[in-house]
């Protein structure tokens, strides 16, 4: 029986749909419908920017049918929902079959965007779990998805969060919520690992061909690797991943759970769980309370990404056909990451063009910051404001080692001596955000939302969508975290 939502009870979102990933067939997915929540849903937060990206009509939230549909309580006209199967390595250990345990794909729009409901109920891949998401984790994912987009970092998007008074149980009873996620593709490294590990080469090839033809068509005409399109594909994914990690490290973003099933094949930030933007700069910071070994510590992220790419290379080996070629396809990561990272850090310093000594300038200030765990975001913003004509004292006040910082600041000033200061200041203010989604800000929004006050979610979203702007009157959102912020524990259930 077809699950295609043609019945009169279906909600029409005003979107046209096409087969997309579903055309790969039943080996890759299971058709199913979301499980309705027992309590009436309500809007928690929404992104008009994501709505415009999808091409939704201006009044898209006015229909009760839309609210019900984006909570999983009503079918969406023209869709055939499904969940996908994948496998992966979790904390460095092969975990076997995983899959979309609480995410159900509505489908792909004619504009080429997949729409997914996260928290919409059990799937065949839920592994005994309830398939639900809780309000706190849903708000965090919604806000961070849009915050990363505001920062210019590749990411899945979030259209909205809907809530319900239905109870779900984690460490404590909580209320259920659903995030509507949007991306060109939600395909992960783990999708390839699944078919490779089970030696299903035909399905592995079909998946790789689908991804190459849809998202990496230039790999078909490459002269690299003797025209091996699969090796060229691996190299392209490596380069996108390297560029993504450079942006994470430059902005101070700690993902927290970089398992291979949480790695996007398109180089997007995906699966916002126990993430954190650094407060004090600690290269060894571990944001995930569940990560007792520190595998996913902030300074380990670039190495972990390369390890994950090596797992992808192993998965693609039946298609690439030569281990040496597969290893060679990974080499670009080692050049792209440092190049992109230094480029991002130079921009934070207001340096549009590279020069000898820039690396020492970057490493020098990071060392000073790490020694005293100086607030990462505030330091860079204050340095930008100093370059824009402000006093140096607000920057100096961040350091106890004034002599050490003054020596660095002198080197910084000498580097800029022959450069246009206004242009440098403009570059810095465009590269160093004033607002990031700090844990305590998210927590305050979550606590308010749990009392049905969603204004804090909307206020935060407005700031995070344009984080480089000053936003007069919002300085409280750009200040130092309160002492209690250090007691917030986030884990894989977050």
Swiss-Prot record:
Active site: 261
Record EC number: 2.7.7.-, 2.7.7.108
InterPro entries reported for this sequence: SelO
Cofactor(s) listed in the protein's UniProt record: Mg(2+); Mn(2+)
UniProt-listed Pfam families: SelO
Reaction(s) the record says it catalyses: L-seryl-[protein] + ATP = 3-O-(5'-adenylyl)-L-seryl-[protein] + diphosphate; L-threonyl-[protein] + ATP = 3-O-(5'-adenylyl)-L-threonyl-[protein] + diphosphate; L-tyrosyl-[protein] + ATP = O-(5'-adenylyl)-L-tyrosyl-[protein] + diphosphate; L-histidyl-[protein] + UTP = N(tele)-(5'-uridylyl)-L-histidyl-[protein] + diphosphate
Annotated keywords: ATP-binding, Magnesium, Manganese, Metal-binding, Nucleotide-binding, Nucleotidyltransferase, Transferase
Origin: domain of life: Bacteria
One GO MF term: magnesium ion binding
Binding site for ATP: 99, 101-102, 118, 130-131, 181, 188, 271
Family as reported in the entry's similarity comment: Belongs to the SELO family.
Primary role: Nucleotidyltransferase involved in the post-translational modification of proteins. It can catalyze the addition of adenosine monophosphate (AMP) or uridine monophosphate (UMP) to a protein, resulting in modifications known as AMPylation and UMPylation.
Identification of the protein by name: Protein nucleotidyltransferase YdiU
Naturally occurring in which organism (per UniProt): Variovorax paradoxus (strain S110)
UniProt gene name: ydiU
């Amino acid at each position: 029986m077809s699950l295609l939502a043609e019945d009169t009870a279906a909600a029409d979102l005003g979107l046209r749909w096409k087969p997309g990933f579903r055309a790969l067939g039943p080996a890759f997915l299971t058709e199913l419908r979301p499980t309705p929540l027992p309590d009436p849903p309500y809007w928690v937060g929404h992104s008009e920017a994501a709505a415009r990206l999808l091409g939704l009509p201006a009044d898209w939230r006015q229909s009760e049918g839309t609210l019900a549909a984006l909570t999983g309580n009503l079918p969406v006209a023209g869709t055939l929902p499904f969940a996908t199967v994948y496998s992966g390595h979790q904390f460095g250990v092969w975990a076997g079959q995983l899959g979309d345990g609480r995410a159900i794909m509505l489908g792909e729009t004619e504009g080429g965007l997949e729409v997914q409901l996260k928290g919409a109920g059990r799937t065949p891949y839920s592994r005994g779990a309830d398939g639900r998401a809780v309000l706190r984790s849903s708000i965090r994912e919604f806000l961070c998805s849009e915050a990363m987009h505001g920062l210019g970092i590749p990411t899945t998007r979030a259209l909205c969060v809907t809530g319900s008074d239905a109870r779900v149980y984690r460490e404590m009873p909580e209320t259920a919520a659903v995030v509507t996620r949007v991306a060109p593709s939600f395909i992960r490294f783990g999708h390839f690992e699944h078919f490779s590990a089970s030696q299903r080469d035909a399905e592995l090839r079909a998946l790789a061909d689908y991804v190459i033809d849809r998202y990496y068509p230039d790999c078909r005409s490459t002269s690299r690797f003797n025209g091996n399109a699969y090796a060229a594909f691996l190299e392209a994914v490596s380069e996108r991943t390297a560029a993504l990690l450079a942006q994470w490290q430059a902005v101070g973003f700690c993902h927290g759970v970089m398992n291979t099933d949480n790695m996007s094949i398109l180089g997007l930030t995906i699966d916002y769980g126990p993430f954190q933007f650094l407060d004090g700069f600690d290269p060894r910071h571990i944001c995930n309370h569940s990560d007792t070994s520190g595998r996913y510590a902030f300074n380990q992220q670039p190495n972990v990404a390369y390890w994950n790419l090596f797992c992808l290379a192993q998965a693609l080996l039946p298609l690439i056909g030569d281990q040496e070629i597969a290893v060679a396809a990974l080499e670009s990561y080692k050049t792209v990451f440092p190049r992109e990272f230094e480029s991002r850090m130079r921009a934070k310093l207001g340096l549009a063009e590279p020069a000898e000594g820039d690396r020492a300038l970057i490493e020098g200030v990071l060392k000073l910051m790490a020694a005293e765990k100086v607030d990462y975001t505030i330091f860079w913003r204050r340095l930008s404001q100093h370059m824009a004509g402000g006093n140096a004292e607000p920057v100096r006040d961040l350091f106890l080692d004034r002599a050490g910082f003054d020596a660095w600041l002198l080197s910084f000033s000498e580097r800029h001596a022959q450069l246009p200061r206004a242009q440098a200041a403009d570059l810095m203010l465009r590269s160093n955000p004033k607002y990031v989604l700090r844990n305590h800000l998210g927590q305050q929004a979550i606590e308010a939302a749990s009392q049905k006050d969603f204004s804090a979610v909307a206020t935060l979203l407005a700031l995070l969508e344009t984080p480089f702007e000053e936003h007069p009157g919002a300085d409280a959102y750009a200040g130092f975290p309160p002492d209690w912020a250090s007691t917030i524990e986030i884990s894989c259930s977050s």
